Amino acid sequence: MEIFPISLKLQQQRCLIVGGGHIAYRKAILLVKAGAILDIVAPDIDPQLMSLIEQSAGTAYVKLFEDHDLDRVYRLVIAATDNADVNKRVFEQAELRNLLVNSVDDIPNCRFMVPAIIDRSPLLISVASNGASPVLSRQLRTQIETLVPHGMGKLAEFSGQWRSRVKAQITNPDERRIFWEELYASPLKEQVFNDNLDIANQMMTQSLAEWTAPKGEVYLVGAGPGDPELLTLKALRLMQQADVVIYDRLVSAPILELCRRDAEKVYVGKARSNHSVPQEGINALLVKYAQAGKRVCRLKGGDPFIFGRGGEEIQELFAAGIPFQVVPGITAASGCSAYAGIPLTHRDYAQSVRFLTGHLKEGSPELPWSELVYENQTLVLYMGLVGLEHICQQLIAHGQRPDMPVALVSKGTTPEQKVVVGTLSNIASKIAEYQIHAPTLTIIGEVVSLREQLQWL
């Protein structure tokens, strides 16, 4: 994030625009709407702009810009002339005086940028691109305009009228936030939109009278293999309402960014033989936070019920009498194979697929080898990188062809995805050669040969 978005109160604050044409007029409208006192410095001032100056009780200085014009006390300054040299000079002089300054469409000479705005006062939504693409910002604003009802401003104003009373009655900030979230999902919203304020006030009074502190709950959420666009809608909704997010090493940073920003985030990362928090500790954390009345999102890479130890966690929750939800995620086998261009089943090559873990409880991959050498079958190994050489040797020893195709998909579905293809006889030697690191999925079977034709990334 290269810029820090803020909302600036400008009521009765004196602001300066240097420039008197249509560029200045566009910015002046926004400043006057925000309640600013508007001064203009320009040799020629558009009549419409002059009326805005009068409306705001500001001053028109009909002259060329001079450095001392900034010696007056201004909250912010906008350079809006069609002369780049003048705009740069305004910027430099404002910087010397530590004034917030914007040069219209001239990013190097800006201390702040004016975003595209969706106005549902008192609710405001802004879209900014750090000056990289104002047109894109405006297009996004147009899309958002269609999604946000005009009545949202009324709802924000209505909420403001009740805010003090709600705060006085529900003193716990987390509980208060849940109260408002539930209220905004209730029929009250439509009553406010339709100006039925008497009914809305009655509903508010009743909601406060009936309010009880919520019980804690755990959401066991599959985050998928890494690409945030592979999240389910339900996963995203629960991630954004959770008070606490307990996440592991396989949850990618872009996915974690989608969680509620003010949620407490607890890292319990797991790597082979290096668990920052052991499974028993994770189970205890889930119970502790839920018993404290928190909504807890246990965020897991892939799917929580496929080699994710989700079953163990909800057994603990069940024993403690804690309510929970389970949200499936796209498992690594599905996501990584698709992004690698390797179908796990194909009528000509594989009529079945088996998911296996190469990292067993005792630390050694002892698998039913004779069952794994059937024809027309795809094997998918999770956590099999360390024991891959042993696995390949055992498959060959139990009758599998040494030239059976194998693919390693490292960090699948992410921008760092790497795919290495080999055979049972040589794939282990390629790990060091291509610097393959966990998390890596191993796919064994004739379907791997289709990658050459079907890869799309």
From Swiss-Prot:
Pathway linked to the protein: Cofactor biosynthesis; adenosylcobalamin biosynthesis; precorrin-2 from uroporphyrinogen III: step 1/1; Cofactor biosynthesis; adenosylcobalamin biosynthesis; sirohydrochlorin from precorrin-2: step 1/1; Porphyrin-containing compound metabolism; siroheme biosynthesis; precorrin-2 from uroporphyrinogen III: step 1/1; Porphyrin-containing compound metabolism; siroheme biosynthesis; siroheme from sirohydrochlorin: step 1/1
PANTHER family named in the record: SIROHEME SYNTHASE, SIROHEME SYNTHASE-RELATED
Entry keyword set: Cobalamin biosynthesis, Lyase, Methyltransferase, Multifunctional enzyme, NAD, Oxidoreductase, Phosphoprotein, Porphyrin biosynthesis, S-adenosyl-L-methionine, Transferase
EC number, as in UniProt: 2.1.1.107, 1.3.1.76, 4.99.1.4
GO biological process: cobalamin biosynthetic process; methylation; siroheme biosynthetic process
Protein known as: Siroheme synthase
Active-site residues from the entry: 248 (proton acceptor), 270 (proton donor)
Pfam families on file: CysG_dimeriser, NAD_binding_7, Sirohm_synth_M, TP_methylase
Catalytic activity: uroporphyrinogen III + 2 S-adenosyl-L-methionine = precorrin-2 + 2 S-adenosyl-L-homocysteine + H(+); precorrin-2 + NAD(+) = sirohydrochlorin + NADH + 2 H(+); siroheme + 2 H(+) = sirohydrochlorin + Fe(2+)
Region of interest (Uroporphyrinogen-III C-methyltransferase), residue spans: 216-457
InterPro entries documented for this protein: 4pyrrol_Mease (IPR000878), 4pyrrol_Methylase_sf (IPR035996), 4pyrrole_Mease_sub1 (IPR014777), 4pyrrole_Mease_sub2 (IPR014776), CobA/CysG_C (IPR006366), NAD(P)-bd_dom_sf (IPR036291), Siro_Cobalamin_biosynth (IPR050161), Sirohaem_synt_dimer_dom_sf (IPR037115)
Binding annotation for NAD(+): 22-23, 43-44
Domain of life: Bacteria
This protein's record includes keyword Disulfide bond: no
NCBIfam families: cobA_cysG_Cterm, cysG_Nterm, PRK06136.1, PRK10637.1
Modified residues (Phosphoserine): 129
Cited function: Then it catalyzes the NAD-dependent ring dehydrogenation of precorrin-2 to yield sirohydrochlorin. Finally, it catalyzes the ferrochelation of sirohydrochlorin to yield siroheme.
Family statement: In the N-terminal section; belongs to the precorrin-2 dehydrogenase / sirohydrochlorin ferrochelatase family. In the C-terminal section; belongs to the precorrin methyltransferase family.
Entry binding sites for S-adenosyl-L-methionine: 225, 301-303, 306, 331-332, 383, 412
Chain positions covered by the region annotation Precorrin-2 dehydrogenase /sirohydrochlorin ferrochelatase: 1-204
Molecular function per GO: NAD binding; precorrin-2 dehydrogenase activity; sirohydrochlorin ferrochelatase activity; uroporphyrin-III C-methyltransferase activity
